């Protein structure tokens, strides 16, 4: 019997002002336990590295207004808001 990869859900988040129009698609299921450990580590560097693993796509900008090719090039305030919005969105998902 061969294994198949489950179809995991994602959530769409929209950041708060002053990041109007900034959105991201983020993993809501199938997230490795290590990502949760890193988010709760108390280390900003480890938490941000974990955040990067959650983001599937985004339209974030750098501090000079250019598209951020790497989510970690976006302003810290935007990334903090993204983590909060992701947590709220995942908690609000109905059970399967």
Stretches with model-predicted labels:
Residues 1-10:
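Extended acidic low-complexity intrinsically disordered regions
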Residues 8, 18-96:
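Short, surface-exposed, charged amphipathic helix/loop patches that serve as local interaction elements
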Residues 11-15:
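A short beta-strand micro-motif
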